Amino acid sequence: HNSDSPAVKWSSDGTVEYKMTTADKSDRGTDIIMYIDSEHKEFLEKDRIESILKKHCRFLPVPIVSGKKQEWKDGKYVETEEDNVINNTEPLWKKAPAGLKDEDYTSFYHQLYPMSMDEPMFWIHLNVDYPFNLTGILYFPRVKSNLDLQRNKIQLYSNQVFVTDSVEGIVPEFLTLLHGVIDSPDIPLNVSRSYLQSDSNVKKISSHITKKVSDKLNEIFKNDRSQFEEKWDSLKMFVEYGMLTEEKFYDRAAKYCLLKNTDDKYFTLDEYKSLIESNQKDKNDTLIYLYASNKVDQFAPIDEAKQKGYDVLLLDGPLDVHWIGLLEQKIEKTRFIRVDSETIDHIIEKDDNSSIDLSDSQKEALNEAFTSQIPKLDKTNFTVEFKTLDETARPVQITQNEFSRRMKEMSAMQQGMAMYGEMPDMYQVIVNVNHPFVKQLVTETEGKEKDSIATYAEENSKLKQVIDLALLSSGMLRGEELNNFVKRGFETI
């Protein structure tokens, strides 16, 4: 301030042109006068003005006064003599973490997100002054379902002035799932995302935040394993997303990321490998990780696997199909196979003994009998396969190849894979040639012509029942076929 200098008036009509002239003003300070046309009168409303100020200036380091505070008196609100300061000049992220309590962090979280009903799981207080300036607080939100995940919840400030809530290009993509505040004067403003990604300070800030997040997760895992397991279902998608998109984060997270089995027990990658490696290696010495995506729908194959002494993981998240593909690349001689993608006797191939004691003509006759009675489902193809299983195993099972099913699932989330989404679902009808009922079918269809086999199969109520039971156990018996199945059941009463 120079008391001898004349006041200056800056004026503009809203274009890039402006004028500067001397003005008649003796008191210190700046008056900003904006003129609103008749079409934008809502910007003169008190609530509208305060909402704009609160969004962009609610943590400005100097007080902002908007009128006077009001109180309820004599049945109405009246103004008091106290100024209505709408901003917090000393936000929590500017304070020393040592002097703060958990209540301070949760209270500030609800100040940032007043519509949130849940408490954050935990938080990270950032405070760096070299080689760049960075302060802030990042919160891990409590996720109840995949639909709760929202991006653009991190607010970027520069010296306590709000800049944006779109921080892509400033922090790694997976960190955009977090909530909170980042404040740094070293992040260039009003530049393209491509420029941000190449800026040296932004790279350092991004790397630092990633490391702090990983260190916090590792700290909780080491110091309180039970708490970490309790929170894992909410953390899982965040950690998997980070491992899929950030190589350095994968290397750190591989030590503490968890696998949950169908008995709700948690294991690290190393712990689970030790658990199954003595019993779940195939003939090629590949370690087979069996998993289910739904404990209810896949109860039967899960139960069969457990009776074999196998352990089954529960992988029911939207990123799991991508994540297990990454693990198969990273961990040598490892395969993930869903427990219903093959019969339990063949899901982990221990030897090459898979001979079928049927002639080609017997196979053709049996194939015709089953094919003629399998219902025609939209965008679904069935292929009959013969396998030698235990005679106490089910006579017919429906399976779906791991690769084709996985490609279909990935196509639903990933651009460039639409061709897999348009392909029909491919299922295998596994016929157990060792089962007494199938042996009887072989005898009764042998030597018959194709047409007569179809007629025989049409009249064989047991064959229809066996096929429908296989479809029912796979959740594929619907509509007319399900209704006919129920009718046949009542007819036996």
Enumerate the predicted regions with their spans.
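Conserved GHKL (Bergerat-fold) ATPase module
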Residues: H1-I493
